[in-house]
Regions:
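Beta-strand/loop edge motif enriched in small/polar residues
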Residues: 22-240
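Bacterial N-terminal signal peptides that target proteins for export
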Residues: 1-10
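Sec-dependent N-terminal signal peptides of Gram-positive bacterial secreted proteins and lipoproteins
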Residues: 11-15
Length: 240
């Protein structure tokens, strides 16, 4: 369903490494699957285990401002991120539904001034994810991370400490267990009107609008990032 240049759907990719590897890079990346990743689906209201991240016996970091502590070492992301946020290492993160960064998936004003049709400005929020962070989507839900137009994801892992998105159950061998990662942008789309003042392409996965006329638009960086076990179908031809 990859027909939109204005966005990337990075889902249903079983342990695929995105970016940061040159053609002759022979670096090996090993990821040990915990016995219970996030603990969100097995521990009732208590959230199960203390999160999928291995803190090596050290006291885990506290949950960043704007997140909610589910259990020790596990922080739930909010439904909306409208300003810059950093997901620090030392704890893991849980998504129980859609997490939307920015508001650029709304319809744009038809006069082409770059504002939304309700008169509000497009937010420019940046979600930074530190190396080694694990982000879990609640198993059996459409939990997903949506980066909207005007906002960015800066996910810069390393070979020794990749950033991993997966469901919150044990292991990494499933598929279609949660939604995935959706990235919108202002890049040109083949359905945008030639010479138009604005472009709104209704995107799949019920993720709102994307598209524009900026061929140099950037929605951030993905380096040593793994997206595993994702994929959610809303209806035929409409999926993450």
């Amino acid at each position: 369903m990859m027909r939109q240049a204005a966005k990337m759907f990075l889902t249903f990719l079983m342990l695929t490494i995105l970016g940061a590897c040159s053609g002759d890079d022979s670096t090996t990346i090993n990821i040990e699957a915990p016995s219970n990743n996030g603990g969100g689906s097995d521990g009732g209201s208590g959230g199960g285990d203390s999160g999928g991240g291995d803190t090596g016996g050290e006291t885990p970091a506290t949950c960043p401002e704007g997140t909610t502590e589910v259990s020790e070492g596990l922080c739930e992301l909010p439904a909306t991120i409208s300003s810059d946020m950093t997901l620090k290492s030392g704890v893991s993160y849980l998504m129980t539904g859609r997490v939307t960064v920015g508001n650029g998936n709304g319809q744009l004003e038809t006069n082409g001034d770059g504002t939304l049709d309700d008169g509000s400005a497009v937010q420019a929020a940046t979600l930074t994810i530190e190396a080694g962070v694990e982000v879990f989507g609640e198993t059996g839900t459409f939990a997903n991370l949506l980066i909207t137009r005007g906002s960015k994801i800066m996910a810069m892992g390393t070979a020794d400490a990749p950033i991993v998105f997966s469901s919150d159950d044990a292991g990494y061998d499933g598929s279609g267990e949660w939604g995935g990662l959706i990235i919108h942008g202002y890049a040109p789309h083949n359905e945008c009107a030639v010479g138009g003042s604005y472009c709104d392409i209704d995107s799949e996965g019920e993720s709102g609008f994307a598209g524009g006329y900026d061929a140099d638009d950037s929605s951030g960086v993905l380096r040593y990032v793994v997206v595993a076990e994702g994929g959610y179908e809303f209806s035929t031809g409409n999926e993450i």
